[in-house]
C-alpha cells in the first residue's frame, strides 16, 4: 500500500486547484496526497534542500528563488504572449514572425517550409485558430537546433536567452546564489545557454532535461519508503 503520493503539475499553485486535484487523486489512490507546482518540482529536483535560483526553459519558461524548503520569490512567467522569455514558444514566435515578413535567411526559410510541409496561411491558422499554439510554436525550436551555425539563427537564440536573464534571473540575488536549469530547451541549447550565462558572470553547474532524478533523490532523503512520485510532464519542461 502506498503511504503517500506527491503530484507536481503546471498551475498547481492556488489552494483551490490543489484541493480539487488532490481530492480526485485521493479517490484514485486511496492514500494521502500532496499536490505541488511544477516549479517546486524543478526547484527540489535541482537543489534538493539547498538554496538557489531554479529556472525552467521548455515550451514555456519560469523561475524562482528557492530557500531549500519553499519558493520565496517568483518572477511571474507571463505566458508566451506577455512573457516566457527564453522558451521554445517565444523562440518559435520570433522566428515565424521573421519568416512571414521575409526577414529570415532564404535557405533557412526554404528548409522550414519543406520540413514542416506548411504554408504561410497554415502558419497563421496554427497560431490563431488551432488548439495549443504555444506547443506548435515550440516545435520550431527543435528545427532551429540544426541551424545554430547560421549567424541569424544563432543571434535569435542568443537574444531569446539573454532576455530570460535580463527580465527574470537578474531580478533575483543571482550573484550570491547558484543558478540551475531544467527543461528540454535548456538541455538542447546547453552550450549556448552557458555562454549567455557567462556574459552575466554566471557559471552554470547543472542543466537537466527533466527534474525527475533529482526529485527521486529529494524524496528519498525526506520521506519513508512506499512513496509514489509523479512529476507531470508539463509544457514547462517539454
Residue ranges of model-derived segments:
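N-terminal short beta-loop-beta anion/metal-coordinating cradle
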Residues: 1-13
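Phosphate-binding/catalytic loop of phosphoryl-transfer enzymes
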Residues: 12-107
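Conserved small/polar residues in nucleotide/adenosyl-binding loops
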Residues: 227-234
